[in-house]
Structures are given as structure tokens and as C-alpha cells.
Amino acid sequence: MRQIQTDRLIIRPLLIADHDELQEILLDPQVVRYTRYRDLKTPENFDNVFATHFLETPFAFGIETKIDHKLIGFYEFHPEATTGVLTYALSQSAWGQGFVAEVGTAMMAYGFEVLNFERIEAHYASHNPRSGKVMAKMGMRDLGSFGISVSPHTGEVREVMAYELTREDWLLNGSQQQAV
């Protein structure tokens, strides 16, 4: 993937040079509280995930600010047949600025045009409704409850909510933009 630019951001493949900044983001308990990465607790845990999951993949991307070229988070797809399940996280300093929705619009195009997904889905914990609002801003449709999830590490029980966007709806809504 070449980089994709939005008004304020650069979306690009993650690099070895991003290790320390991404580690800082993903080892922040508040950032990963509602994500699949909440069980990363140590630099060693992160190192393994970084090497095997974030580098050299067409599915994970760094989010960098144009103004100072700082890595502020990541966005990724988990492919499941013709569906891409998305995950994203931003450093706390980047919260509340509309970055995820801005990136999401470009990444929907990438998911449909380049990765050829027929459907993009996103999940969030019911007690984190801000994520649901961001998904709606990205043009996704609320599917309601996806079921209950129990953390294998903490035993925490969460209701998981889901949103989706189909290729057909994306084309009908005219929300597409150039992906690459």
C-alpha cells in the first residue's frame, strides 16, 4: 500500500521505526481498554505482536499527522472471508478531534477497492458508545448487539455492539473516495 492522505492525516504501512511510538500507544491501558489489544501488558508482549501482526501486512496501517509527522495510532482490518472487521486505536492526545472518522472514510475505500471486501464490520463494547458514534460518522449502519464477550484473562463480561457497511451501500451513498 502506498500512503493515503486525508486533510490532516497520512495513512501508511507501519514501519520498524514506528515501534516505540506504537508501543507507547498500545501499552496505555486507557487506549486499549475496549480493544482486542487490552491484554498487552508488557513491552515483551508488544514486541511479539508488533513483529507478527503489524509489520509487512496489507491489513494494518499507521495514522500519522501531516503537521508534525507524529504517529498517533493505527487502523487495521481483520479479514474474514469477504468481510473486513476493523479495529483502530489512537493515543489519548489525539482523542476527540475527529481523526478516526476522517481515516475511516479513506479506509472504507481501501477496503472495498483494494482489498475487495463485500462488507466491513466494526465492534465496540456497549459501555463505550463514543465508538459507535464514530462508526456512524463513517457511514456504517447500526446492527445492535453482537452478543456477550468474556475476557479469557480478566473474566470481564461485555456486551459487544456491531456496525457494518456493505459495498452496495457504500456505492449507493456515494461516499467513496480514491483509495490509492
Describe every region a protein language model picked out.
Residues M1-Y34, A60, E64-V180:
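Acyl-donor (CoA/ACP) binding surface of acyl/acetyltransferases
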Residues Q30-A51:
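Conserved GNAT-fold acetyl-CoA-binding loop/helix
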Residues P43-E44, E56, A125:
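Conserved, charge-rich beta-strand/loop surface module that forms ligand/interface-binding patches
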Residues F50-G62:
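A short helix-loop-beta-strand connector motif used in the catalytic cores of GNAT acetyltransferases and
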